Amino acid sequence: MRVVGLMSGTSMDGIDAALIDTDGEEVQWLGAALTLPYDATTRALLVQAMEDARGINHRTDRPGVLRAAEIRITDLHAQAVRQLLDQLRLTPSDIDLVGFHGQTVFHRPDARLTVQIGLGQRLTESLGVPVMADFRAADVAAGGQGAPLVPVFHRALVRRLSLPHPVAVLNVGGVANVTVLDGDAPPVACDTGPGNALIDDFLFARTKVPFDADGRTAARGTVDEARIAEVLAHPFFRQPPPKSLDRNDFRLFVGERMGLSGMGLEDGAATLTALTAATVAALVPLLARPPASWIVAGGGARNPTLLAMLVARLGAQVSVDVRTADTVGWSADALEAHAFGYLAARALKGLPLTFPTTTGAPEPMTGGVLFRL
């Protein structure tokens, strides 16, 4: 079936929309994709929504600006789908399903609570197409971490490649997550630590620029290894998979341990970028076997400084091959959007989305809620 997958990640920079042909088991093809960037007003609304979400006690709570943000992003997701279809000279009648992740504003699996804002019924009524949404809730309610969700999609893609195993697929969004695939063994997955979020927030606070384009600011700075070691002492980095993070979990901790307020712009950016690489490398000793191949996707794949730091830190442990998703025929920018198209098709068939080795769920679990006209 033809599915449009939608993703608005923790970097909060925009909506990725991507077309995929899949039956929820095999991937027939990965189609075109686009990004609908958030304007400054929408991003500010989402930043405030993240703050207001701290008052959530139940997954239906919408304190502060959350209701307004939910309506706004739903309508923008509809716009993203229409733009993608227009680009391809298609209409909504040409697709079978939409996979709608929504925007994560609160993620506390220890409290069995995760909230992704987005109105599935409003989206299906706008587009006239069935919508699968709310992918994480069932896993979290059962005691799983609710993240990462994409490992089963990574497994379907990696099966088509001829790369030395184990293969690690690293997505560097606001939070970084990894899937480790080793032959026929169940996929192992977890969040590794901060991805782009801390770097983006630091740059924006200092310069009002939303991200470090091409890692140029970090490339001019000097990494403070002692401050990175302070952060790596946190118990999270010694905890084996599965494990997950909220976007803001390390914001205060890193700010205090690194003394970011006292660091210059370039050195702060360099040290935060190196921290992302270091937290990925810190996972390797916790795995049964070190990955021989790494495929990097997400915004981090567009940051040459981060990629160089990853190569240096991963290569210090074992000889590895690090490449970006684009080099294996995937879209580094749209991989998660493609994933949610795949997961939507999978959920429609009642197939498992998560596994004990990926989220800590007690058993393989399906998920998602289907919205129809």
Curated annotation (Swiss-Prot):
Keywords: ATP-binding, Carbohydrate metabolism, Kinase, Nucleotide-binding, Transferase. InterPro entries: Anhydro_N_Ac-Mur_kinase (IPR005338), ATPase_NBD (IPR043129). One of its GO terms (molecular function) is kinase activity. Coiled coil: none annotated. Pfam families: AnmK (PF03702). SUPFAM superfamilies: Actin-like ATPase domain (SSF53067). The keyword Nucleotide-binding applies. Its EC number is 2.7.1.170. Pathway: Amino-sugar metabolism; 1,6-anhydro-N-acetylmuramate degradation; Cell wall biogenesis; peptidoglycan recycling. NCBIfam families: PRK09585.1-5 (NF007141). PANTHER family: ANHYDRO-N-ACETYLMURAMIC ACID KINASE. Catalyzes the specific phosphorylation of 1,6-anhydro-N-acetylmuramic acid (anhMurNAc) with the simultaneous cleavage of the 1,6-anhydro ring, generating MurNAc-6-P. Is required for the utilization of anhMurNAc either imported from the medium or derived from its own cell wall murein, and thus plays a role in cell wall recycling. Belongs to the anhydro-N-acetylmuramic acid kinase family. This is Anhydro-N-acetylmuramic acid kinase.
